[in-house]
From Swiss-Prot:
It is an enzyme of class 7 (translocase). The modification Phosphoserine is found at S432. Belongs to the ATPase alpha/beta chains family. This is ATP synthase F(1) complex catalytic subunit beta, mitochondrial. Its EC number is 7.1.2.2. It catalyses: ATP + H2O + 4 H(+)(in) = ADP + phosphate + 5 H(+)(out). It comes from Canis lupus familiaris (Dog). It is a peripheral membrane protein. Homotrimer. Component of the ATP synthase complex composed at least of ATP5F1A/subunit alpha, ATP5F1B/subunit beta, ATP5MC1/subunit c (homooctomer), MT-ATP6/subunit a, MT-ATP8/subunit 8, ATP5ME/subunit e, ATP5MF/subunit f, ATP5MG/subunit g, ATP5MK/subunit k, ATP5MJ/subunit j, ATP5F1C/subunit gamma, ATP5F1D/subunit delta, ATP5F1E/subunit epsilon, ATP5PF/subunit F6, ATP5PB/subunit b, ATP5PD/subunit d, ATP5PO/subunit OSCP. GO terms for molecular function: angiostatin binding; ATP binding; ATP hydrolysis activity; MHC class I protein binding; proton-transporting ATP synthase activity, rotational mechanism; proton-transporting ATPase activity, rotational mechanism. CDD domains: ATP-synt_F1_beta_C (cd18110), ATP-synt_F1_beta_N (cd18115), F1-ATPase_beta_CD (cd01133).
Length: 546
């Protein structure tokens, strides 16, 4: 049976190739002519009631269906590469994207949804443009799929603005060359691995270490501190996680179902979707973010979870199109596909898109082509550590593994740089002393090393912070700490100004003043228990003496 299917596929492919004529060169010319027409600038926003095909658009018919690949024949008006086609006579909307030209009249397309029920001879209409999706403030608080359809059961997205998902990166003259920190209000991030406005951040973390909570806090803080919007693109991840994230955002107030104060737009193409949808959903999310940057001058936060799935889907599409695979089975256009998307994530003179990308590393192999290609584009890495999460320190960001390209005295200033490096040095010294402490105990350390350990433990606890989106779980009121307060607090701990305070005073507080207030409160509670011990406490003390 498999052999028969293989022969049918091979016959279909060879039949298509026969249409190319004696030389494949004309096909290359067609591709090169078609591409610029299909790529439309993200700054050209069409105003229309819906992205319906144009009147009098070219009509074709399906001639072959091989899984997610559909071949469509046009008698005239061959659609350019990347154009969106719509299959007629179906209850649900099925969009096909032109990927290749086979001969003079046939195009090979990738389906954006399941191809179940398709038959040869079915009519297909050319939309005359790439896939267009709704953009604008009306998308906030809503969930859409790769082709811009709402999937949150809350009716249509009422916007007149539509934009093509394929666009050129901003021109050099439009880009801003100023390096600027995006202050997140999260102490450990702002101090040790600051995010650059318009930068790309890789978020590494396993299950249960707080990736989702960190993402939600970043969305919340950017909305409150900068008035900015966020876009979350779920690329090839679990549907359950996407559903959980949506409901957690409603509970924490990031999404408001009652009015128009939502601060985030969600775009989902989960792992049950065909490869075409997973390969394009990141571009759909990016297009929504580009509107807020270019038309409203916003500093937008774009979350992509997971960028590896974008590459994985591209690999599947490439194999379906019959391209010869490159290293480790990835598509030969891996670097091009990644670069085309990543170059659109940048700062312009109007606004910025700062991207936080969760990265799955296959088999923990950082040399795998997929993560290795992503690393080339990253400006900062935020590593979430299970060992730190086990200590109860949240956010569980590893202060020694997390890095940032803008951690440079010329960008962040000498004071910030010196404090950050001082914090990392003392934490590294503490890490190297832990083996000695485990074997010989604290008493065997020199006075200088004891002081290092004491300050490092205070710094470690001061790197924790109560999150506003986690108030309902922790009972601690969330804190957003300005960068100046963060630098001042760590500077004073390093200088030894708080050597007299107990280390538990530094746990789960905002600025340093709260640690001092907490220490005073702990001292009062301690003195109160000393002066008036309870009868049970006195009895227990007597029992211990005996």
């Amino acid at each position: 049976m498999l052999g028969f299917v293989g022969r049918v596929a091979a016959t279909s492919a060879s039949g298509a190739l026969r249409g190319l004529g004696p030389s494949p060169l004309p096909q290359v010319k067609v591709l090169l002519r078609a591409s610029p027409a299909a790529l439309q600038s993200a700054r050209d926003y069409a105003t229309q009631t819906s992205p319906s095909p144009k009147a009098g658009a070219a009509t074709g018919r399906i001639v072959a269906v091989i899984g997610a690949v559909v071949d469509v024949q046009f008698d005239e008006g061959l659609p350019p590469i990347l154009n969106a086609l719509e299959v007629q006579g179906r209850e649900t909307r099925l969009v096909l994207e032109v990927a290749q030209h086979l001969g003079e009249s046939t195009v090979r397309t990738i389906a954006m949804d399941g191809t179940e029920g398709l038959v040869r001879g079915q009519k297909v209409l050319d939309s005359g443009a790439p896939i267009k999706i709704p953009v604008g403030p009306e998308t906030l608080g809503r969930i859409m799929n790769v082709i811009g359809e709402p999937i949150d059961e809350r009716g249509p997205i009422k916007t007149k603005q539509f934009a093509a998902i394929h666009a050129e990166a901003p021109e050099f003259v439009e880009m801003s060359v100023e390096q600027e920190i995006l202050v997140t209000g999260i102490k450990v991030v702002d101090l040790l691995a600051p995010y650059a406005k318009g930068g790309k951040i890789g978020l590494f973390g396993g299950a249960g270490v707080g990736k989702t909570v960190l993402i939600m806090e970043l969305i919340n803080n950017v909305a409150k501190a900068h008035g900015g919007y966020s876009v979350f693109a779920g690329v090839g991840e679990r549907t359950r996680e996407g559903n959980d994230l949506y409901h957690e955002m409603i509970e924490s107030g990031v999404i408001n179902l009652k009015d128009a104060t939502s601060k985030v737009a969600l775009v989902y193409g989960q792992m049950n979707e065909p490869p075409g949808a997973r390969a394009r959903v990141a571009l759909t999310g990016l297009t929504v973010a580009e509107y807020f940057r270019d038309q409203e001058g916003q500093d937008v936060l774009l979350f992509i979870d997971n960028i590896f799935r974008f590459t994985q889907a591209g690999s599947e599409v490439s194999a379906l199109l019959g391209r010869i695979p490159s290293a480790v089975g990835y598509q030969p256009t891996l670097a091009t596909d990644m670069g085309t998307m990543q170059e659109r994530i940048t700062t312009t003179k109007k606004g910025s898109i700062t991207s936080v990308q969760a990265i799955y590393v296959p088999a923990d192999d950082l040399t795998d082509p997929a993560p290795a290609t992503t690393f080339a584009h990253l400006d900062a890495t935020t590593v979430l550590s299970r060992a730190i999460a086990e200590l109860g320190i949240y956010p569980a960001v590893d202060p020694l593994d997390s890095t940032s390209r803008i951690m440079d005295p010329n960008i962040v200033g000498n004071e910030h740089y010196d404090v950050a490096r001082g914090v990392q040095k003392i934490l590294q010294d503490y890490k190297s002393l832990q083996d000695i402490i485990a074997i010989l105990g604290m008493d065997e350390l020199s006075e200088e090393d004891k002081l290092t350990v004491s300050r490092a433990r205070k710094i470690q606890r001061f790197l924790s912070q109560p999150f506003q989106v986690a108030e309902v779980f922790t009972g601690h009121m969330g804190k957003l700490v300005p960068l100046k307060e963060t630098i001042k607090g760590f500077q004073q701990i390093l200088a030894g100004e708080y050597d007299h305070l107990p280390e538990q005073a530094f746990y789960m507080v905002g600025p340093i003043e709260e640690a001092v207030a907490k220490a005073d409160k702990l001292a009062e509670e301690h003195s109160a228990t000393q002066t008036s011990p309870s009868p049970k406490g006195a009895a227990a003390x007597x029992x211990r003496v005996v």
